[in-house]
Structures are given as structure tokens and as C-alpha cells.
Amino acid sequence: MAAGLDSWNSTINGTWEGDELGYKCRFNEDFKYVLLPVSYGVVCVLGLCLNVVALYIFLCRLKTWNASTTYMFHLAVSDSLYAASLPLLVYYYAQGDHWPFSTVLCKLVRFLFYTNLYCSILFLTCISVHRCLGVLRPLHSLSWGHARYARRVAAVVWVLVLACQAPVLYFVTTSVRGTRITCHDTSARELFSHFVAYSSVMLGLLFAVPFSIILVCYVLMARRLLKPAYGTTGLPRAKRKSVRTIALVLAVFALCFLPFHVTRTLYYSFRSLDLSCHTLNAINMAYKITRPLASANSCLDPVLYFLAGQRLVRFARDAKPATEPTPSPQARRKLGLHRPNRTDTVRKDLSISSDDSRRTESTPAGSETKDIRL
């Protein structure tokens, strides 16, 4: 994402000073030009490699898909698209907030960030709901868990997110500041109030609601799974796997999405209040630090691919055809085995021919005719 105070006037050395509301705060953001290029570079390499491998497994190794694998496939597609766009941001921040590319590319990079962010949230929500239904309504989930239903849900998710994030292409723009071109992640100054209202709606619709659903799923599953079936002790393996999956989803939310949305909301709110420069500097720094965490979900999502299903966990073993080990000559002699030679083959053929001749001579003609009629 671009600099947090993008609508403020920038100085040449990367600090920021007041806006139209009369603030005269200057923030030293030198740390950003090291933190963001390094973190985005790591996310780009790891995220792209892990998700490309995951896509290969989904497309080339899995023979049958269920609802979970369908959602994970679309999650990997979204993460791969985002990771592929990060080299442009790495260059942008390494150059000190200078965007030498076109405005269209600036809009596309910001659009991919928010699209990946909310696609990840919604697909993780779908995985959690699917697991929860498998625990609470195992019989009904047999029909709801088909891949064809998951494909329809995934299509709805893509359409919903693309439609909701389309305004980003309108708000995001570039501006010339001295000798540099800034690629804003919010909007121009005159549209900022509209952008804040739009972001608030997206916060509630695409983050608060899914996060609440995941929390409800986790609570319901925990209550059910803490009660073992009558006459049994412990939890079945399938139920333990469901709990691990949703617990991992909650960890991803807690680490990546929650800090980002909290600090961004505070940042947008504080910009319209007459607060001290110290307070604004603190929230500005927190907002910058949480942006790499929001991007890190592209690397953490593939962990789900290897923990959620048995086929994905065993993909490395299934990738090569199973072969039986060839016994050594000593082992063959111990077991009474030996490699057949030409003499053994001739003897075996003669024995089979002799047995066939004896069976033919002992079979009555009537029996042969009867067998043919049957």
C-alpha cells in the first residue's frame, strides 16, 4: 500500500507536513523505505513460490475436489495475483515514494491489494463455515459439500469483491510532488471524505461480518467437539482436523487482518480530529507497520492447503508412482525365490501343455456339447 498520509503535502526528504485543516506535523518516515521494500520482497518471493506450488498440486495432482479444496484453489489464485504485483511496490518504496509507471498501473496495484485482502477474508470464511457444518450437521454437509456448490459460492465471492472494489479504480490516482510522482492508496484530497465513507462500508461488509461469522463458527464447533460421543473417549480425527483448521484461520485473522483494519480505521478517524502531532505520528507509524502484516497472508494461506485435507498433506508421497522394492539376490535365495531362466520357462510350458492334454482326454464329448449350449 502507498504512504499512509498520501493526501498530505510531502517534502523532498520523505517527511510529511500539514494539510488543509491547519496541521503542521512533520513525520520522519525513513523506516518505511526499508521496512516496506524488504517485507514486500519477502512476501513476493515466498508467496509466489508457495502459491504456484499449491496451484500445481490442485490442478495436476488432485483427482477429485471437494468444497474445501475448491475454496483453497481460489484463495491461491487471489494470493498469486497479489504476489505478482508486489515487485512494482518494492521498486516504488525503494525509490522513496517515486512512481515512474503509469497511473493505470498504480490503480491496478492498489486494486489487486484490496481484492486479495477481501477475497482472502471471504474464502477463509467459506472454509470455516464448511468445516463448521461438517461438525454440526455431518449428514447435511454431505450434500452441501459438493464441489459444484462450492464453485457457485466462489463465483459469487469473486463477483461481490470485484464489484465492491471497483471504486478503488476511481479513487486511486497519482500526483506530482516536486520531482517525484506519488501513487496514492487512498484518494486525492478533494475526494478523501468520500473515500473514508466508502472504506467504512467495506470495513463492515467485508471484514466485520466475516470475522463475526468465523468467531461464531469457532464457538459452536468448540462446544460440540468438547462433548465426545456417547460411549467414546477423546475426539475423532476428522473433528480434530476441523478445529485445527478454524483455529488457524483465527490466527491468520488475528495476525494479518485485525491489526491492519484497526490501525487504518483509527488513522482515517484521527485525520479529521484536532490531535497532537505525537498522537498522529504514533498512529501513522502503527498503520505503516501493519501493512506488511496484511500482505503476509499470501504466505500464511498456503499453510491451510497442507493442513486442511489428507490428500494435500500427502501430496509429496503421491507425486511419485509407488514402486515395490526389488529383493536382493541373498533375500531371494532365503525366500526360495530365483530369477526364471529360459530352461524354467520351457519346463513350465511343457507342464501346462501336458495338463491340458490330460483334461481334454478325460472330458466326455457330451459334456463338451452341453457346455457349448450353455
Curated annotation (Swiss-Prot):
Principal cellular location given in the protein's record: membrane
Give the positions annotated as glycosylation sites: 9, 13
Gene Ontology CC terms, in alphabetical order: apical plasma membrane; basolateral plasma membrane; early endosome; glutamatergic synapse; plasma membrane; presynaptic active zone membrane
Leader peptide range in chain numbering: none
- One of the record's GO molecular function terms: G protein-coupled UTP receptor activity
Membrane topology is: Multi-pass membrane protein
Q: For this UniProt record, give its keywords in alphabetical order, as a comma-separated list.
A: Cell membrane, Disulfide bond, G-protein coupled receptor, Glycoprotein, Membrane, Receptor, Transducer, Transmembrane, Transmembrane helix
Bias class Basic residues marks the residues at 331-340
Q: Which family does it belong to?
A: Belongs to the G-protein coupled receptor 1 family.
Protein name, per record: P2Y purinoceptor 2
